[in-house]
Amino acid sequence: MTAYDMEKEWSRISITAAKIHQNNDFEGFTYQDFRTHVPIMDKDGFAAQTERCLERNERNCLIGFTSGTSGNIKRCYYYYDCEVDEDSSLSNVFRSNGFILPGDRCANLFTINLFSALNNTITMMAGNCGAHVVSVGDITLVTKSHFEALNSIKLNVLLGVPSTILQFINAMQHNGVHINIEKVVFTGESLKTFQKKIIRQAFGEQVSIVGVYGSSEGGILGFTNSPCHTEYEFLSDKYFIEKEGDSILITSLTRENFTPLLRYRLGDTATLSMKGDKLYLTDIQREDMSFNFMGNLIGLGIIQQTIKQTLGRSLEIQVHLSVTEERKELVTVFVQASEVDEDERVRIETAIADIPDIKEAYQKNQGTVSVLRKDARDYAVSERGKMLYIIDRRN
């Protein structure tokens, strides 16, 4: 792996960017000119640009609402056909890599928990690959006869976020039906080790698992089918990517987006590096993964780092914030029961309590920490079906 050179990449794509964004100045810009003259697009800037596009756009669109990681409702528009620039279309990305092929029979799990926008765009994308698509709907209403019906059509692909894929597996097994799934395509969040284990236990070690990195505003940005599923190949013909401080910014290089993105801040951070002529993203995470505890800002990363230093390995954790009956703030850190014994749980609890900004709350006798073992499948998820990292119930 070598470092990503934004100056060099800008030189490669500046003419394309000038055409897509109808700004001839871009052709003569150096990358530093681009940074200086083009402001970063935030959520408000995206909304304003969307309104301008609505005023002049004659094509009909799908309107999708998504809560985002923040929980705030935001509106996005998508072209119905998903095929604007054929050479870089979403469907070609999936077809050319063999993720979804003609004749595949795909279960669209984005209809679980009201994923309306992803439901339609994923259905259209899979359809354009030549695949057949069935929308599963609310998994709590799916019975044994429904799973038998899915078996009868030779269902072989699952499309969804990790938690909805696990919901499907749990319901399938509860109803005593086995479906021979050959491929699992996940997006929306990273695939945890325990989730991957459950998928392989359900469908066999040979099942193909593909991860898709994307955003509501930009669509599909990258993909991974590496064994670790943490190294995403970025679609550098679709977007120009920058790293400004810790922030990831993207600029559209095709006409696929209803709202063209120009230095749009995703709210993610990642490590950018090159392998040959391909750009890869690793260590993708949200920029702000922290919480306020007794006046101190505690990053989720420092807790994860403390656990790794204590045990010599990483764990998937979930943090709950609450208030005790004595009106003291309580930080409860859930760790995987299958990965941690009682002795290790105590060691983790002691180590977290010794984090300086947390220890201060102990010294004031105003806060406390508890570490509990829990089945990772019982970790709380959001209304969108994503695993929550920090849950604040102090109100």
Swiss-Prot record:
It catalyses: (indol-3-yl)acetate + L-lysine + ATP = N(6)-[(indole-3-yl)acetyl]-L-lysine + ADP + phosphate + H(+). It is an enzyme of class 6 (ligase). It holds the Pfam family AMP-binding. Disulfide bonds: none annotated. Keywords: ATP-binding, Auxin biosynthesis, Ligase, Nucleotide-binding, Plasmid. One of its GO terms (biological process) is auxin biosynthetic process. Gene3D superfamilies: N-terminal domain of ligase-like. Conversion of IAA to IAA-lysine. One of its GO terms (molecular function) is indoleacetate-lysine synthetase activity. Belongs to the ATP-dependent AMP-binding enzyme family. This is Indoleacetate--lysine synthetase. It comes from the Bacteria.
